[in-house]
């Protein structure tokens, strides 16, 4: 998708040419799953698939918004005077939520606009289409109203929309990965301190292949909130003896020595994943820095095993993709990415093997699950921008 095609779509819907066009990427997480609300590290990257928008300012307080991805919703309208969540406003609640949270900061928001949105992220795939939308709206609002918020501040507003406006217990990784994305760079983020460091994603003869189960996952309908509550309860029990604020404060040995305090087999497994995954993420960052791709791949594999055995968030579809990927030539590693329960996995695949990889994994998946998977080679991209 480019400026011209999006502008044409906008003109067909609103009968005038747009004033500006914007883009916001999606994201993958290389490693560090379910660590962001446990005070641990994550290692995500923005990708070239994402969400586009064409925009024109209005001289009143009205908003008219349309998404080519949700055509049945039609043109949705709302006013600056009523930014409360309304289920009838469908996807427009992402824009309303960003406006609602930014309005709390005494920023001048004095007019509405017309907006045409078209994304190429697969729906409900776990590639963060919601965070992509939030950061897209942040970029548009930044431009529309001359806001002085920096990228990290806008990222935090996006998380507030998820937590306060939608009532979801999500961490900050998705918004951060997108809002702070850099081309060909992954981001090691300490979610406890918000310290971050970029790492060149120099994979040489290898590429990241995204594998889509085509099984929809709904964050609010999944066991995401249950897993978070389990980790919080395990932490509370550890804190009866240990002076820690998060599970991410522990290393593997410290956890093993004190796991008896949790006194519940399921909670021990959940907490063990959080602690060990955090350490794997740090080791993976170190491996990439040293160009040790074999070690990086082994850590990626270990992450999926933990997400399956200790955290129980994978499921038959993701396990079929990942376990089949492990058996293919030219594969360094593979794991689920995102919240799980469907959605996507990633594999680090030698470029020369990609076509055969997709064919073999695709055949096994369709034979096993009964419907085809989709595959995309990930390009690591910059964060939100005006085109």
UniProtKB/Swiss-Prot annotation:
Positions marked as site (Transition state stabilizer): 27
Keyword terms, alphabetized: ATP-binding, Carbohydrate metabolism, Cytoplasm, Galactose metabolism, Kinase, Magnesium, Metal-binding, Nucleotide-binding, Transferase
Q: Name a biological process GO annotation.
A: galactose metabolic process
Q: Can you tell which superkingdom this protein's organism belongs to?
A: Bacteria
E.C. number: 2.7.1.6
List the catalytic activities from the record.
alpha-D-galactose + ATP = alpha-D-galactose 1-phosphate + ADP + H(+)
Residue numbers binding substrate: 33-36, 224
A GO molecular-function annotation? ATP binding
GO annotation, cellular component aspect: cytosol
Q: Which Gene3D superfamilies match?
A: 3.30.230.10, GHMP kinase, C-terminal domain
Similarity-based family: Belongs to the GHMP kinase family. GalK subfamily.
Q: What does this protein do?
A: Catalyzes the transfer of the gamma-phosphate of ATP to D-galactose to form alpha-D-galactose-1-phosphate (Gal-1-P).
- Matching PANTHER family, A to Z? GALACTOKINASE-RELATED (PTHR10457:SF7), MEVALONATE KINASE/GALACTOKINASE (PTHR10457)
Query: What's the protein called, per UniProt?
Result: Galactokinase
What would be the name of the gene that encodes this protein?
Answer: galK
């Amino acid at each position: 998708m480019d400026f011209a095609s999006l502008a044409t779509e906008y003109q067909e819907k609103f009968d005038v040419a747009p004033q500006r066009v914007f883009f916001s990427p999606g994201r993958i997480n290389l490693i560090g799953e379910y660590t962001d609300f446990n005070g641990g590290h994550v290692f995500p990257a923005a990708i070239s698939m994402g969400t586009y928008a064409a925009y024109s300012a209005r001289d009143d307080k009205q908003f008219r918004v349309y998404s080519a991805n949700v055509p049945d919703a039609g043109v949705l309208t709302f006013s600056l005077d009523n930014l409360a969540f309304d289920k009838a406003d469908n996807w427009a609640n992402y824009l309303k939520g960003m406006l609602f949270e930014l309005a709390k900061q005494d920023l001048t928001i004095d007019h509405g606009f017309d907006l045409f949105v078209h994304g190429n992220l697969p729906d409900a795939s776990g590639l963060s289409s919601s965070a992509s939308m939030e950061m897209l709206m942040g970029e548009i609002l930044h431009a529309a109203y001359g806001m002085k918020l920096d990228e990290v501040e806008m990222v935090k507003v996006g998380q507030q929309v998820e937590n306060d406006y939608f009532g979801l217990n999500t961490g900050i990784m998705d918004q951060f990965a997108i809002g702070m994305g850099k081309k060909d760079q992954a981001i090691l983020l300490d979610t406890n301190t918000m310290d971050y460091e970029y790492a060149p994603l120099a994979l040489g003869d290898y590429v990241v292949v995204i594998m889509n189960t085509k099984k929809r996952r709904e964050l609010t309908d999944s066991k995401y909130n249950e897993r978070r509550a389990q980790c919080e309860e395990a932490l509370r029990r550890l804190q009866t003896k240990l002076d820690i604020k998060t599970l991410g404060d522990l290393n593997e040995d410290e956890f093993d020595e004190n796991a008896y305090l949790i006194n519940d087999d399921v909670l021990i497994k959940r907490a063990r994943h959080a602690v060990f995954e955090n350490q794997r993420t740090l080791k993976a960052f170190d491996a990439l820095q040293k160009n040790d791709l074999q070690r990086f791949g082994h850590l990626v594999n270990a992450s999926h095993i933990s997400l399956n055995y200790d955290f129980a968030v994978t499921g038959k579809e993701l396990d079929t993709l990942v376990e089949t990927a492990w058996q293919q030539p030219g594969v360094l590693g593979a794991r689920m990415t995102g919240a799980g329960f469907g959605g996507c996995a990633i594999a680090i695949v030698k470029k020369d093997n990609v076509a055969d990889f997709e064919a073999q994994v695709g055949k096994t998946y369709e034979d096993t699950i009964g419907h085809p998977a989709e595959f995309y080679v990930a390009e690591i991209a910059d964060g939100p921008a005006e085109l």
